[in-house]
């Protein structure tokens, strides 16, 4: 059985409570091998009130929570019977199993929240020569001059038109030679 992302419908305004309840239930019922992550999709927004800027988190999908599950009868039961959960999105009728999100859909949502699904192993070093594999500089080679672990980016000096040109790239856009 493989793990997939599913969308769970909740009472609006109860998303964080459902997340907390579900995480407690997973732990108390020993379901960590079936239910992996519970995510309330949020993004930061800047509101201006009385001339003051304030950064607030807004729900991207009010009334919905994403859950990464290996779908079995037990895992379905645990999620479905969590207080505040009204059901799975994509299940037609009682007892039917829900439809998972497509892999790209979950990844897009997580990326939008800064929780990229695919974390790359970072074993690049300064001054290392790498090949650019994606983007407008694909197939160029260059030397790593800076590594920003927080942003998952590197600055690579690429030789273009006889000069070293600094290019900022994501870890996923480069490969070791």
From Swiss-Prot:
Give the matching CDD domains.
KOW_NusG (cd06091), NGN_Bact_1 (cd09891)
* Name of the protein described by the UniProt record: Transcription termination/antitermination protein NusG
Q: Which InterPro entries match?
A: KOW, NGN, NGN-like_dom, NGN_dom_sf, NusG-like, Rib_uL2_dom2, Transcrpt_antiterm_NusG, Transcrpt_antiterm_NusG_bac_CS
Give the family, as the similarity comment puts it. Belongs to the NusG family.
Q: What's this chain's function? A: Participates in transcription elongation, termination and antitermination. Stimulates RNA polymerase pausing at U107 and U144 in the trp leader. NusG-stimulated pausing is sequence specific. Does not affect trp leader termination.
Task: List GO BP terms, alphabetically.
Answer: DNA-templated transcription termination; regulation of DNA-templated transcription elongation; transcription antitermination; transcription elongation-coupled chromatin remodeling
In its keyword annotation, does this UniProt entry include rRNA-binding? no
| A Pfam family hit | KOW
Superkingdom, natural source:
Bacteria
GO cellular component, alphabetical, reads: cytosol
Matching entries from Gene3D superfamilies are given as: 2.30.30.30, NusG, N-terminal domain
The keyword Transcription appears for this protein: yes
* PANTHER family per the UniProt record, alphabetical: RHO-INTERACTING TRANSCRIPTION TERMINATION FACTOR NUSG, TRANSCRIPTION TERMINATION_ANTITERMINATION PROTEIN NUSG
Ranges for the KOW domain?
128-156
> Which keywords accompany this UniProt record?
Transcription, Transcription antitermination, Transcription regulation, Transcription termination
């Amino acid at each position: 059985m493989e793990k997939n992302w599913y969308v769970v419908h909740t009472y609006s305004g109860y998303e964080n409570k459902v997340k907390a309840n579900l995480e407690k239930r997973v732990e108390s019922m020993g379901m960590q091998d079936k239910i992996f992550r519970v995510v309330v999709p949020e993004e930061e927004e800047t509101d201006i009130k009385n001339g003051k800027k304030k950064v607030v988190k807004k729900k991207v999908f009010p009334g919905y929570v994403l859950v990464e599950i290996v779908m079995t009868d037990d895992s379905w039961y645990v999620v479905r019977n969590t207080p505040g959960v009204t059901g799975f999105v994509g299940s037609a009728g009682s007892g039917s199993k829900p439809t998972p999100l497509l892999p790209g859909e979950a990844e897009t949502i997580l990326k939008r929240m800064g929780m990229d699904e695919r974390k790359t192993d970072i074993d690049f070093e300064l001054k290392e020569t790498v090949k650019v594999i994606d983007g407008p500089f694909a197939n160029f080679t260059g030397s790593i001059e800076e590594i920003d672990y927080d942003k998952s980016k590197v600055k690579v000096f690429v030789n273009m038109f006889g000069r070293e040109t600094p290019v900022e790239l994501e870890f996923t856009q480069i490969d070791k030679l």
